[in-house]
Amino acid sequence: MPDNVLIHAIKADITSLTVDAIVNAANTSLLGGGGVDGAIHRAAGPKLLEACRELGGCLTGEAKITKGYRLPATFVIHTVGPVWHGGNHGEAELLASCYRNSLKLAIEHHCRTIAFPSISTGIYGYPVEQAAAIAITTVREMLADERGIEKVIFCCFSDRDLDVYQKALAAG
């Protein structure tokens, strides 16, 4: 990975971050929901919902992009993480795909800074320790030869999640 790429974890409200793109842990409809998805839709305003309606949904592991509207972020990248079913149903590969496809869209749109929530670890039940390891490994692999992205933020909701991400970053 290029030395100029900064990857770190913070505890913050992802909707308040001034970055080129924030990632939304969405559901397949892209029409808003609970958790970070609902918070992003509320903060971005009704034009985000209109834009998401036009996208026609999103498959698990895929990603789609919209403007940020009323958010400080220029773009919102919507990705649909897997629901945890014990770990033997392709969840790890689907979760890695969320990060890969989100980064691909960010690179295509010339984003230099991107913030990710902890995808699938809320109501979808993915164990945070496993999700953090997949997130960090996938991001590092994707950025190994990439020169466009300068900063990746893992934006954590709780102190516990932040601790897990910080330990995973330090270990790797």
Curated annotation (Swiss-Prot):
Domain Macro: 1-172
Transmembrane segments: none
CDD domains for this protein: Macro_OAADPr_deacetylase
A Pfam family reported for this protein in Swiss-Prot or TrEMBL: Macro
Lineage top rank: taxon: Bacteria
PANTHER family: GANGLIOSIDE INDUCED DIFFERENTIATION ASSOCIATED PROTEIN 2-RELATED, MACRO DOMAIN-CONTAINING PROTEIN
Family named by the database record: Belongs to the MacroD-type family.
UniProt-recorded name of the protein: Macro domain-containing protein CT2219
Protein's organism: Chlorobaculum tepidum (strain ATCC 49652 / DSM 12025 / NBRC 103806 / TLS) (Chlorobium tepidum)
